[in-house]
Amino acid sequence: AYRAYLAPAALEELVSLCCWGFGAQALASGGSPLQRLFSGKSELSSLVTMDERIEGGLAPAFTAEGPRRPLRLISQGRPGERLVSSRSAAEYGLIANGACSGEYPLSLHMHGGELDEQHVLQRLGTGLYIGNLWYGNFSDLPAARLTGMTRFATFWVEDGQIQAPVNTMRFDDSLFDFLGPQLEALTREPELLPGGTYGGK
């Protein structure tokens, strides 16, 4: 295992694989990769807060289900609201909140932290700078365990200095590890990454 910094595009690849798991139907059926979070069996780092946002995103404020609502999906590592379509509302006795029929976020916003981007390498020290990932898939869905490959802009860093590019590497780890107790910091500066939902792929 290596210390690693995941650039926003790399982290988006991981989160987008799991984001349909916020849906009411997926959670009610027990098939969500976020089941452990919403059942209280696991928590993410308290640094992690995610919203389904309306303002500032690229998605329209309406779906075929009606007007979307801003939702706090994860609050400081703990489960928040779920995405509820009209069908799930009727089936499970919930209140619909404008989620699309697939019940995945259309404009997922992850709150930033306190780390300045210019200090990333210094904070990393020695380890991997991972700029992008691809071929992501589940190796163990109930555990939110993901596998995939580094893509480009992956470098070996020593003592806060980039030493060399790294050949393609395979990863296999759980979202509860990436964003769990081992998470040390999040960068402060937001980055808008269009078209990153699971349903949009």
Region roles according to the model:
Residues 1-22, 80, 178, 186-190:
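Internal alpha/beta scaffold segment
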Residues 24-32:
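Mature, solvent-exposed C-terminal subdomains and processed small-chain segments of exported/organellar
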Residues 34-201:
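Dual-mode signal for accessory low-complexity, basic/Gly-rich regions
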